[in-house]
From Swiss-Prot:
Main location: plastid
Chain's role: Participates in electron transfer between P700 and the cytochrome b6-f complex in photosystem I.
Chain sites annotated for binding Cu cation: 106, 153, 156, 161
Keyword field: Chloroplast, Copper, Electron transport, Membrane, Metal-binding, Plastid, Thylakoid, Transit peptide, Transport
Name of the featured protein: Plastocyanin, chloroplastic
Keyword Nucleotide-binding: no
Cellular compartment(s): Plastid, Chloroplast thylakoid membrane
Gene Ontology molecular function terms on file: copper ion binding; electron transporter, transferring electrons from cytochrome b6/f complex of photosystem II activity
Membrane topology recorded in Swiss-Prot or TrEMBL: Peripheral membrane protein
A Pfam family matched in the record: Copper-bind
Source organism of this protein record: Spinacia oleracea (Spinach)
Residue span(s) of domain Plastocyanin-like: 70-168
Cofactor: Cu(2+)
Gene3D superfamilies, per database record: Cupredoxins - blue copper proteins
Length: 168
């Protein structure tokens, strides 16, 4: 245990009317050891908590992964008239974002004869007159009925700008 002794003189101005009387006694300070509360977990409990955190993180990643959209480019960087990718799969309820990649006017029309029965092509397609004219413009659709859907760009269908999506 350590002790500290100190002494100091205090000078008090005379105009206050106060006077220091006598001498200052040395004081001692004692250092008292203290303990800090440390949570104690067994190694087994710690590993259990880490395992639960890993499972929760993985589950969140899977759920977030299902909410992600698939991006399909309308037109290639080289000027080609194509959907990129042209043949792909999505989960039922997954959003598909068709994005104009070039300055050409494009649209997305689902072929009413090449989609699952009971699906209304007009509800999932752009109008044939409606176009994405500028780079970066998008059209979004979510398909819920499982099956194969064929689609095309009406201004460039004759040039082979067609695609297919399989909904699982």
């Amino acid at each position: 245990m350590a002790t500290v002794a100190s002494s100091a003189a205090v000078a008090v101005p005379s105009f206050t009317g106060l006077k220091a009387s006598g001498s200052i006694k040395p004081t001692t300070a004692k250092i008292i050891p203290t303990t800090t509360a440390v949570p104690r977990l067994s190694v087994k409990a710690s590993l259990k908590n880490v395992g639960a955190a890993v499972v929760a993180t993985a589950a969140a990643g899977l759920l977030a992964g299902n909410a992600m959209a698939v991006e399909v480019l309308l037109g290639g960087g080289d000027g080609s008239l194509a959907f990129l990718p042209g043949d792909f799969s999505v989960a039922s309820g997954e959003e598909i974002v068709f994005k104009n990649n070039a300055g050409f006017p494009h649209n997305v029309v689902f072929d009413e004869d090449e989609i699952p029965s009971g699906v209304d092509a007009a509800k999932i397609s752009m109008s044939e007159e409606d176009l994405l004219n500028a780079p970066g413009e998008t059209y979004k659709v979510t398909l819920t009925e499982k099956g194969t859907y064929k689609f095309y760009c009406s201004p460039h269908q004759g040039a082979g700008m067609v695609g297919k999506v399989t909904v699982n």
